[in-house]
């Protein structure tokens, strides 16, 4: 038996952020508005969002202190603000980090224990606050996943927490107009993450016909429109396609998981500060080559080539060039002596466990030797 978990309600299309007040008023009366995108705040977006919520009868508190790869301490700060304000619904408008911190705060809102303890023990409360997610980047697809990735700064490690029901946003509002001001560099890295998630969820060893349907469409949408969105951020058609592709990839990975790319991207990001999307983009061609034999045997490699219109490994290399991204991490201040530890962390990842080709610690170390 397979359960297919998605947000109860998904609203999409240009201008659909205008439904925010209506949707929030159905879930609560006191909103914690979590904002992370500087372009939203600088364009007066925070005031507009607050205005929609207050017009719908909600009181509003704004939380803007969101860092990339959010640390557990930031979740603790947000949880305290939620208690002080008496918030009964979270509204997250931003990229993947905003979604992560909001989902973590929602599930831990009723706990008195530090976030880091919950992350370490993987024990979560049995109730949460409802949440609305409105992405400002096409990337993580977090508006459609029940997972939050957090950084424990005390050990420089990224770990995820997951609850299939209590951490899934109640409403996903996916408006491409929120993404028009996303800078080219962020568009490239986050969009590459969306593409990689579509590919890895398609190649996962625990796919179903439903996850394949989502990931296949996501692959086509992101492969065809990512460079367009990168070259011209005002291209609404490309932004819409990327928004839908990211959403579908999120729906796929929420149910099929991912693979070694994400299994290694998290420790690389946690240890060396490499942005998550960039880490995923760089790792993809190496991991596709690692998985090639198994994917060819299953027929997935040929199906992926059909979706892309070319050899998948070649496409992954060309994607890096088209987005002006590096082919390895050697320009970053990485410490190669940590490769054994990074490989160990990769082995602990649920993403690695879903990889189509089983991986050993030595396999992961060999991949890391190539990219670091």
Language-model region placement:
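ATP/NTP phosphate-donor binding region
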Residues: 1-89, 329
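Buried hydrophobic positions in well-ordered alpha/beta secondary-structure cores of metabolic enzymes
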Residues: 13, 33-34, 71, 96, ...
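Short glycine/serine/threonine-rich phosphate/pyrophosphate-binding segments
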Residues: 17-20, 42-45, 72-73, 97-104, ...
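Glycine/threonine-rich beta-strand-loop-alpha-helix active-site module
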Residues: 73-176
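Glycine-rich phosphate/pyrophosphate-binding beta-alpha loops
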Residues: 139, 247-280, 349-353
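Carboxylate- and glycine-rich phosphate/diphosphate-binding segment that chelates Mg2+/Mn2+
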Residues: 147-256, 356
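Gly/Pro-rich interdomain helix-loop hinge
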Residues: 271-338
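Short, amphipathic C-terminal "tail helix"
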Residues: 338-372
